């Protein structure tokens, strides 16, 4: 187990609004686990040679042209710092993009103080931070995407191929399926091959698992 440092995590706050900078200063003073190194209003004001933060809290509004690209540039300049976006931008529109650009977390300025402190703590330990609302939204998107992908693949099957899958889900082998459907074993093998291709399944075992999930309405 690696020893954990008790030194306060150093924070650099980049925001063009004075009221936000004052609010952050007042907040951080109440939490000894953090140390506010300073403020900047523009990305050009920040250079690695002059400051070495553990956390960079930034409002992407400071980058007038492309805030997402600014995050990538910031990550290149401060490769050892964790970036937390603290902004009024809608998290449902910008959070995922910010994470892909290199941010470790995303917090709305309207979030409760406790959430911001949790966000700072999480990113300082190398963890990703998103609000509970945003985490649920992303999980729903993933679930809906997978369900839609399964449905679209499933609709490519012919009626006879669907019947073959039904028999596979009942643990029937090719000989039994051929007898049940009154067709040759070679035809069943051809059906199975086409089913795997249409469903993008790489092996017979994957086909069996898909058939079982379908039988249980869990695909």
Can you describe what each PLM-predicted range is?
Residues 150-186:
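Helix-turn-helix DNA-binding segment
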Residues 193-219:
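Basic, Lys/Arg-enriched C-terminal extension of HTH/homeodomain DNA-binding domains
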Residues 39-55:
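Acidic, metal-coordinating helix/loop segments flanking the phosphotransfer/catalytic sites
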Residues 66-69:
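Acidic catalytic/metal-coordinating carboxylates
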Residues 94-100, 104-159, 163, 213-218:
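Short, flexible helix-to-coil linker/hinge segments that flank and couple to helix-turn-helix
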Residues 59-60, 87:
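Active-site residues of response regulator receiver
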Residues 7-20, 24-28, 56, 157:
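Conserved acidic segment of CheY-like receiver
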Residues 33-42, 201:
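Short hydrophobic/Thr-rich beta-strand motif most characteristic of the beta2 strand and flanking loop
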